[in-house]
């Protein structure tokens, strides 16, 4: 949030794309045994084309993922469902891609200008995730969330954080170990 504000105060137009909005329906992923980390879990072609378009200065319309019902606004072919409501994103000078692994996907890495990994201590990360997953997305029951958060940290470090650290351009480490 502070980084966004700093860019905007400098006259830059800023927007963000949340990678999770490109998830396909959870029921489909579970039926196919697809893990949520990786392009198989996404409306991948739509994600890739959206990045191409927005980096060319075009407005994009992306899927909207409903975290309560675990469904996408788009069908498996990437078309808007009859009751779907996409997210409209205007082009900007600075485009943040929020997600656990966007620059680990070879097909889109060339579309990402500066690859930044932002590390924080568990209490800070948990507060941010609580705000997003409990307050905003209404995704988890609080006790389940706390248990899942600490259970999954090592797994996420292995499949997402460490690999990204190996290929990022900048690592912003605000953790106590920095």
Where are the model-predicted features located?
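A conserved segment at the C-terminal end of the G1
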Residues: 1-11
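Short, structured coil segments at secondary-structure junctions
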Residues: 10, 110-112, 166-167
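Conserved beta-strand scaffold positions in the cores of enzyme catalytic domains, especially
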Residues: 14-16, 115-117, 169-173
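Short, glycine/acidic-enriched loop or turn micro-motifs at the edges of active sites
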Residues: 21-23, 101, 122, 176
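Small-molecule kinase domains that catalyze NTP-dependent phosphoryl transfer to phosphate-bearing small molecules
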Residues: 136-178
């Amino acid at each position: 949030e502070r980084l966004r504000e700093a860019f905007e105060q400098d006259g830059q137009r800023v927007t963000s794309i949340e990678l999770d909005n490109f998830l396909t329906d959870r029921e489909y992923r579970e039926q196919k045994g697809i893990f949520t980390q990786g392009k198989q879990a996404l409306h991948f072609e739509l994600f890739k084309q959206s990045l191409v378009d927005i980096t060319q200065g075009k407005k994009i319309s992306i899927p909207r993922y409903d975290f309560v019902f675990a469904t996408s606004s788009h069908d498996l072919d990437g078309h808007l469902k009859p009751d779907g409501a996409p997210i409209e994103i205007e082009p900007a000078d600075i485009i943040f891609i929020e997600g656990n692994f966007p620059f680990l996907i070879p097909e889109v890495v060339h579309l990402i200008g500066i690859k930044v990994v932002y590390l924080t201590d568990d209490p800070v990360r948990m507060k941010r995730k609580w705000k997003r997953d409990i307050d905003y997305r209404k995704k988890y029951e609080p006790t389940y969330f706390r248990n899942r958060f600490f259970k999954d940290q090592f797994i996420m470090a292995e499949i997402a954080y460490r690999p990204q650290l190996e290929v990022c351009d900048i690592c912003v480490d605000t953790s106590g170990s920095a």
